């Protein structure tokens, strides 16, 4: 059973809203980290890269990424992805659920159930 988890994202994101509703409906204790309100600690990004790989964190499907000049989209590696994410948190797949044991990107009810034991 999860005592506390952290959900990262934007309050206005529909996927984040779905994740928050699921967590609330299933009685999962969590804190919410809003990228627009709080500055993301680079250590969190480093931890996510270490635990999940930068490709799992970096959102190539985001509007922000799609609107980048082609030259900026080329040659992305962990170092470049980290710098881009720290400059623009819209490049993080969201929401991010960190339970301490599980680290999930995006929202899928079955994955949340498995990660939280709910």
Language-model features: where?
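Local sequence-structure signature of Cys/Sec-based thiol-disulfide redox active-site neighborhoods
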Residues: 2-26, 30-35
């Amino acid at each position: 059973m999860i005592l506390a988890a952290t959900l990262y994202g934007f309050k206005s994101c529909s996927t984040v809203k779905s994740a928050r509703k699921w967590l609330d409906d299933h009685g999962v204790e969590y804190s919410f980290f809003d990228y627009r309100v709080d500055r993301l600690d680079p250590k969190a990004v480093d931890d996510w890269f270490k635990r999940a790989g930068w490709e799992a964190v970096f959102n190539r499907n985001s509007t922000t990424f799609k609107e980048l000049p082609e030259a900026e989209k080329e040659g992305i590696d962990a170092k470049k992805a980290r710098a881009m994410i720290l400059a623009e948190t819209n490049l993080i797949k969201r929401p991010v659920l960190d339970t301490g044991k599980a680290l999930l990107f995006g929202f899928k009810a079955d994955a949340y159930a498995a990660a939280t034991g709910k």
